[in-house]
Swiss-Prot record:
NDH-1 shuttles electrons from NADH, via FMN and iron-sulfur (Fe-S) centers, to quinones in the respiratory chain. The immediate electron acceptor for the enzyme in this species is believed to be ubiquinone. Couples the redox reaction to proton translocation (for every two electrons transferred, four hydrogen ions are translocated across the cytoplasmic membrane), and thus conserves the redox energy in a proton gradient. It is found in: Cell inner membrane. Keywords: Cell inner membrane, Cell membrane, Membrane, NAD, Quinone, Translocase, Transmembrane, Transmembrane helix, Transport, Ubiquinone. GO terms for cellular component: NADH dehydrogenase complex; plasma membrane. It is an enzyme of class 7 (translocase). It comes from Aromatoleum aromaticum (strain DSM 19018 / LMG 30748 / EbN1). This is NADH-quinone oxidoreductase subunit K.
Length: 101
């Protein structure tokens, strides 16, 4: 039987992996978006673990809202990436410092 601490440790490990992914890879926007999504999933795992441990459904309902926002964020982020790649032929963060007006 897995206890609450097992889920919290797994959530902390996933969160730490995503933070390391953000700090180590600041060049590629797709990898940055994937690291942010992994961070949100780690937070969702903690919400579900606490919700199950406390016997309350509020945490699980909150996870559905977070997943909805994460899906919208991914769709908008990928749409922005497609537009940037069409215009600039790159998705590296260093090359996105110029603004058109």
């Amino acid at each position: 039987m897995l206890s609450l601490s097992h889920y919290l440790v797994l959530g902390a490990i996933l969160f730490a992996i995503s933070v390391v992914g953000i700090f180590l890879n600041r060049k590629n926007l797709i990898v940055l978006l994937m690291a942010i999504e992994l961070m949100l999933l780690a937070v969702n795992l903690n919400f579900i673990a606490f919700s199950h441990y406390l016997g309350d459904l509020a945490g699980q309902i909150f996870v559905f809202f977070i997943l909805t926002v994460a899906a919208a964020e991914s769709a908008i982020g990928l749409a922005i990436l497609v537009v940037l790649f069409r215009n600039l032929r790159t998705i590296h963060v260093d090359d996105l410092d110029s603004l058109k007006g």
